[in-house]
């Protein structure tokens, strides 16, 4: 663990301190073009996130559900592709990669597929083959970063060429890695990597009771009742106060 952590820290600093050769000139003008093309209006924090990515080789974008992380990924993807930069999308799991593909319209791979590595029969991550495929990318965007553990992150930083951009996207309060380490959380707390935290829930996401209450739980706020929602809110969250086990099971089944 120590060797992997040390290598991750050293390699990330090398990536970050390497000359930024992907700087896009007339940044505000280019972003304005992307907003028009995608028919969106970036929030102040979203603009800041893309600006930080443009100015740094390594950057973290963090935020809960519905805070606009996917919009940032789509905007970055279009921005760099318009400037003939090769953007590679990946995620730790097949489901996350599929979701990333659906929301961006660009193929996203699992990290294992990207690195061309696989698990052995006993399914232990620590025994993954050390032969990995170099990552040919000007910009590498990793989604659901909270699920990436020490070993996988170590392979990623080894495979990424100096001069590439690395963008880590995720929610440190969600979906921790099965393997050792809390990479995303630790990197944020280190304050060594430029980080933009998104906290605004956008109107469409605010219609979901799951998203609103997920943020409330994180912030130590009570669940909000039906009367507090917008009229067109989705019926996707139910809070049932029941202490009797049999009645509780019945309530779950009846939903």
Can you say where each PLM-predicted feature lies in the sequence?
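Hydrophobic positions on the alpha1 helix immediately C-terminal to the Walker A/P-loop
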Residues: 72, 76
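Conserved lysine of the Walker
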Residues: 69
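Short hydrophobic/aromatic beta-strand immediately N-terminal to the Walker A/P-loop
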Residues: 59-62, 88, 167
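Conserved P-loop NTPase motor core of helicases/translocases
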Residues: 86-91, 95-159, 200-201, 210-211, ...
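N-terminal pre-P-loop "Q-motif" helix
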Residues: 39-55
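Conserved helicase motor core of P-loop NTPases
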Residues: 172-255
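Walker A (P-loop) phosphate-binding loop of P-loop NTPases
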Residues: 66
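Interdomain "pre-motor" coupling segment immediately N-terminal to P-loop NTPase/helicase cores
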Residues: 1-26
């Amino acid at each position: 663990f120590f060797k992997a952590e040390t290598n991750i820290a050293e390699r990330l600093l090398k990536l970050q301190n390497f000359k930024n050769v992907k700087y896009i000139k007339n940044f505000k003008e280019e972003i304005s073009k992307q907003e028009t093309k995608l028919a969106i209006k970036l929030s102040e924090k979203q603009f800041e996130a893309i600006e930080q990515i443009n100015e740094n080789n390594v950057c973290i974008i963090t935020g809960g559900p519905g805070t606009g992380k996917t919009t940032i990924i789509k905007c970055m993807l279009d921005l760099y592709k318009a400037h003939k930069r090769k953007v590679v999308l990946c995620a730790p799991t097949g489901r996350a990669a599929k979701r990333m593909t659906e929301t961006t319209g660009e193929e996203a791979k699992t990290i294992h597929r990207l690195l061309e590595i696989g698990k052995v029969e006993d399914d232990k991550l620590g025994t993954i083959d050390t032969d990995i495929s170099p990552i040919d990318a000007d910009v590498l965007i990793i989604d659901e970063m909270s699920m990436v553990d020490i070993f996988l992150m170590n392979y990623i930083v080894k495979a990424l060429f100096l001069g590439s951009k690395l963008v880590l996207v995720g929610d440190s309060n969600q979906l921790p890695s099965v393997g050792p380490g809390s990479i995303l959380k630790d990197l944020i707390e280190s304050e060594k990597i430029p980080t933009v935290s998104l906290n605004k829930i956008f109107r469409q996401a605010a219609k979901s009771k799951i998203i609103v209450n997920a943020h409330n739980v994180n912030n130590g706020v009570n669940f909000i009742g039906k009367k507090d929602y917008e009229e067109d809110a989705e019926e996707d969250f139910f809070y049932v106060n029941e202490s009797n086990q049999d009645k509780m099971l019945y309530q779950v089944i009846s939903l």
